[in-house]
Amino acid sequence: LAAGLVSCGLKAKNSNSGEKDTTEAISSETDKKLEKLESLINQYYLKDVDQDELQQGIYEGYIAGLNDPYSVYYDEEATKSFQESTDGEYDGIGAVMSQNKETGIITISQVYEGSPAEQAGMKDNDILYKVEDEEVTGKDLTEVVSKIKGEKGTDVNLTVLRGDDREEVAVTATRDTIEYPTVSSKMLDNGIGYLRITEFDSVTYDQYKNAYNDLKNQGMKGMVVDLRSNPGGSLSIVCKILDEILPEGKIVYTQDKNGKEEDFTSDEEHQIDIPMTVLVNQYSASASEIFAGAIQDYDLGAIVGTQTYGKGVVQQIFDLKDGTCVKLTIAKYFTAKGQDIDGKGITPDVAIDYQADENNPEADNQLNKAIETLQGEMQ
């Protein structure tokens, strides 16, 4: 246990006054206390002890001691899931599942178009009843999803309940590599293209390019980019997309603990030639704010919606070489014009709160305002 902690220790500089190395002192005291705690647990603790769980708890607690919500230790299972989410793809059946906390019922909330799940006959709102003849209601959702995922080309047998009469339907899906759909698009009236980005993952750039080119081929003359509730993602991917939009210049820059700055820039090869607006809300964070901030700094379109989240820091993943990893905050970022948005967010040019319409669930007053604003620029 102690060795794992020491290997993750934060190094402190020795002072010129000959004082004891702070890191060594902290590590030594930590070793002693851990040994004492281990002795007390072995001697007095009533219940059985899972040593793996205990060890993981130490690592998690060590990073939690930084009091930084963005710095996190991931165990092996969490590391694998995190890697899948950042890669934007996984081997599975292509269905999004949610679980009712009270009943334990697992529902198929979305079946991806063209996925193995769709080909097997699964539908949105099906209830997942069995996986390989084992009932899953009330089981941990993460464990259930892990059983459904598997090697590409292998089959998984599922039973779903469908409709009000809960008809039992057996399906067999052949697992394949599934790409998370992070970009969706459609043409609206009057030559306005709508493009929604839910996250900036490894697959997002190609999905953006395909969606943008498809809208242009349909005659798009103005574009609404919807980043509402987009939590962020990859710094390099959002910069790659912005390189397709901005003129030559700085996109964003970062500054580490030593004051070292790194610029991320766009070249002169690409630049958007149509007006645009960007939709944001209080859940638009990190890479979403980099996108909105760049559009705002270059005056390429109005930012519409509410104040964004205010996550102006950058994290890096460090592989711990044992199947686990740690994510640490390593720098702050600033927009091209030097805006520090950490804890503040991006202030929209056109402020408007979302208002639900009970008579028309499909109504979207924020989108309507973005379209209205864009039409003013298109005239």
Name every feature range the model reports, one short phrase each:
Residues 109, 118, 132, 142-311, ...:
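Cleft-lining beta-strand/loop regions that shape enzyme active-site pockets
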Residues 1-99, 130-131, 136, 141-187, ...:
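Intrinsically disordered, Ser/Thr/Pro/Gly-rich linkers and terminal tails that flank
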Residues 315-319, 326-357:
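Conserved P-loop NTPase
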Residues 103-112, 167-172, 252, 325-327, ...:
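Short, well-ordered strand-loop elements centered on a beta-strand within folded domains, enriched
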